[in-house]
Structures are given as structure tokens and as C-alpha cells.
Amino acid sequence: MIPIGNSISWFTGAILVLVACGTDKPVNEVPSEVASKMAAQEAAWNAGDIPSFMDIAYWQDDALLFVGSKGPTYGFEATLNNYLKSYASPEEMGQLRFELLEWKTLGTKHGFLLGRWALDRGDELEDLSGHFTLTWELKPNVGWVIIADHSS
């Protein structure tokens, strides 16, 4: 959701195809569990806690996909390590704000979330902002988790 970098990939095209196949569920009706997890991630980030930011919503599996400017990263641990390297100080992390723009239901166990992110990093560092697309999956005994994140 916060880029480790920017990238255009086949993943974007695949997601757009999946979105086109969604149901007639109204746009912007983000499931309450997803909205709650996004708010909890925002709070964890703003508390300087990247591990909790990851634990709250990302699928803790080697198949997790994060796409940014450096290309795809696979796996929960690799994605966590990239975040820790890219945002090594509270100043670099700044204060995170999410705006949830559009939810599309993709069957009974998947959804697609389009949103904006912004980092207010004070006077010392340039503020950052961009968009994200998240593919969510409803996992038994876990609930909704992010299985793919494309952030720019």
C-alpha cells in the first residue's frame, strides 16, 4: 500500500480483468472487516510499528505478492523486510492516511480494493502519495487478508 517503489506490470492487467468480472454489489461498500483492518494498519503505521502494520492485514505466506517500482516481491517476510529497509526511521515513515475509493466483489471469497495513500513527513522530508490496488481473500479462521498489493 505504501510503495517500496513504482511499477507497471502484467499484474495490473490481470486485476483489471478480474474487476470487470465482479458482481453487482455496490461500489464503495467495503466490507466492515476490510475497512477495520485498513484503519488498524493506518494506526499501526502512525505508531511506528511496521511489523504490526503487516500482521494486521497481509497474508502471512510465501505466496503473498507485492508489486512496486522494483518489480514483484513474493512472500510475507520479504515484503516486511523491504518495508523496514525503505522506512527505517519515524521521519521516513511519516503519518499515513488511506482513502478507500472503490471495492469490487470478485466472487464469494475475493475482493479488489482501489485506494489512495498519503504520507505526511513533516518539514524535513518530501511528502509522498499514490494509489494502491489490493486483492483480498477471505481465509477460513483468519478472515480477510491481502494476497496481492500493487502500490505506486
Write out the residue ranges for each language-model feature.
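Bacterial N-terminal signal peptides
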Residues: S9-V19
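Hydrophobic/aromatic beta-strand elements that line small-molecule binding cavities or substrate pockets
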Residues: Y83-L84, F98-K104, W117-L119, H131-L138
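A solvent-exposed, acidic/Ser-Thr-rich amphipathic alpha-helical stretch
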Residues: I50-T105, K109
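Bacterial N-terminal signal peptides that target proteins for export
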Residues: M1-F11
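Short, low-complexity N-terminal intrinsically disordered segments enriched in polar/charged residues
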Residues: C21-S52, I56
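A short hydrophobic beta-strand element
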Residues: T108-W117
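Short, cysteine-centered beta-strand-loop-beta hairpins and adjacent loop/turn segments enriched
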Residues: E91, L119-D127
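Short beta-strand edge/turn micro-motifs at domain boundaries
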Residues: S129-S152
